[in-house]
Amino acid sequence: GHSLGAIAGANLLAVANQKIGNAQADALFKFTTGGLAMPGGGIAPLLLNSPTFGPTIQMSVLTGSSAALKTAFTAYAPNCKTAVPTCFVNEFLPSLDATTQASVAGTLQSYSFAAQSVLDSADPINLGRGIAADFPLFATEVVGDGALSLSDRVIPNSIATAPLGGTEPLFKVLALQPLSATGAANHHATRFVAGGHSSLLAPDENFDPTGAVTTEMQT
């Protein structure tokens, strides 16, 4: 699976291969290998901190919960230098006083907690351990090079304020090892320094214009 498919796929691999005591039934949905491209765990903080989806979600939550904040941003909006949701998070919120910023942080924390409470039972961060250690599993993520090539812009690799959110925490739960690791590990991961979130499917015009990353991922 890729992206959301990889999030659901991790859960599927964990559940479908559990034995129920009937050989015929066990064989019906049995998987023999698994591949996860750009997955993530801790779904609520993952979405809130996604460079792509996060600004829209944060703006919706905050303006929906505070009429005063909505009014203030409406007045501020003509000054925006970027897209409206990005402006709201990166330009408008930092311009607020410390008390208001603390209230904003509290609202987002409460929302994240409530959303994660609903999603927790279907979050791969909790189900991933169900994938057997001897099951052949392979996963990929885009980490960037720290300079010109950015990390995944949809699913964050890790989140400073949410240690269980993102791709890397899920990789730890899945006990994924680098391809270069020695030993008999069956769970492996590759971390690409170029490419984008959808490079498995098509070249990223910004970070993989030649298509080299897509070719490597697909082969």
Model-derived features: positions:
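Gly/Ala-rich beta-loop-alpha elbow adjacent to hydrolase catalytic centers
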Residues: 1-9
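Structured segments of extracytoplasmic/periplasmic soluble domains
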Residues: 12-19, 37, 173
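Conserved hydrolase catalytic core segment
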Residues: 14-32
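C-terminal subdomain of alpha/beta-hydrolase-fold enzymes, centered on the catalytic histidine
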Residues: 26-219
